[in-house]
Swiss-Prot record:
SUPFAM superfamilies in the cross-refs: F1F0 ATP synthase subunit C
Subcellular localization: Cell membrane
Keyword check for Ion transport: yes
The protein, known as: ATP synthase subunit c
Highest rank taxon of the organism: Bacteria
Originating organism: Bacillus cereus (strain ATCC 14579 / DSM 31 / CCUG 7414 / JCM 2152 / NBRC 15305 / NCIMB 9373 / NCTC 2599 / NRRL B-3711)
Subunit structure: F-type ATPases have 2 components, F(1) - the catalytic core - and F(0) - the membrane proton channel. F(1) has five subunits: alpha(3), beta(3), gamma(1), delta(1), epsilon(1). F(0) has three main subunits: a(1), b(2) and c(10-14). The alpha and beta chains form an alternating ring which encloses part of the gamma chain. F(1) is attached to F(0) by a central stalk formed by the gamma and epsilon chains, while a peripheral stalk is formed by the delta and b chains.
A single GO BP: proton motive force-driven ATP synthesis
Summary of the function given for this chain in its UniProt record: F(1)F(0) ATP synthase produces ATP from ADP in the presence of a proton or sodium gradient. F-type ATPases consist of two structural domains, F(1) containing the extramembraneous catalytic core and F(0) containing the membrane proton channel, linked together by a central stalk and a peripheral stalk. During catalysis, ATP synthesis in the catalytic domain of F(1) is coupled via a rotary mechanism of the central stalk subunits to proton translocation.
Family indicated by similarity: Belongs to the ATPase C chain family.
Length: 72
């Protein structure tokens, strides 16, 4: 097994771990906000979905970097 494959696995794993933690924090804070101010549910959901989309970009970038590292 080459070092490129190991590096790719580490890149994908760490990016997925970071995204999972980030998504959990975003959703939990959104639920707390809706519990405090139910009238802002729509605005908070919109902001949450934008935040989740930005956090999910991290694993996609990690996969791209992993493919680049594997092919070198």
């Amino acid at each position: 097994m080459s070092l490129g494959v190991i590096a790719a696995a580490i890149a994908i794993g760490l990016s997925a771990l970071g995204a999972g933690i980030g998504n959990g924090l975003i959703v939990s804070r959104t639920i707390e906000g809706v519990a405090r101010q139910p009238e802002l549910k729509g605005a908070l959901q919109t902001i949450m979905f934008i935040g989740v989309a930005l956090v999910e970009a991290l694993p996609i970038i990690g996969v791209v970097i992993a493919f680049i590292v594997m092919n070198k």
